[in-house]
Amino acid sequence: MRTTENGPPRTLHIYARLALATLLAWLAWRAFRDELGSVPLVSDIDLGIHEFGHMLFMPFGIPILGGTMVILGGSLTQVMFPLIFVVYFLRKKEDGARRDVFAAMVCLWWSAINLLDVAIYCADSRAGQLMLLNGLTGEESDGHDWYNLLSGWGLLEHDTAIARWMRGIAGLTCMASITAALWTQLPLISRSRRED
């Protein structure tokens, strides 16, 4: 359902988007309060994207990089994947269709939620308490991605500080994306009321 340049915006469409933005705000609030940053359904999809990222970056696991890109590839892909859709929705279509800034902001929110997930993973580097896919915690196994990354970079003792920065950026990005998503609907609401 698109609004056209000449036609009136569909009121139901506008209110559905407002409801979605409200839901995303609530899910973000819940994720930032949750110890694991979990968002129902989204977190499961993101785990698959994270694991795919490791495979995607395997060709870059050459000895020069010491496998760093394979390890980093999971988190990097998890955060970057939604940004592909941000770019897609912000591009003006060849057929002249308008950009969908609202959809782009929903995808930016998704990327921010993924960054929160990565921050939680990073913060666990030394503690090793998160449960991994193999059923063991990082402490019980040979560590996890962020333990290995930060150890290799000599930054392990800064895991929680780095994670706080990631979390802060994720929080600001969540708030900005939801605000921008709502902002895109204001002219449509105003136009809809004038036409009623």
Regions inferred by a protein language model and the residue ranges of each:
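Membrane-interface helix-loop junction between the first two transmembrane segments
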Residues: 31-45
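Active-site recognition of the HExxH zinc-binding catalytic motif
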Residues: 42-58, 74
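Metalloprotease/metallohydrolase-associated module, dominated by Zn2+-dependent proteases
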Residues: 6-34, 62-196
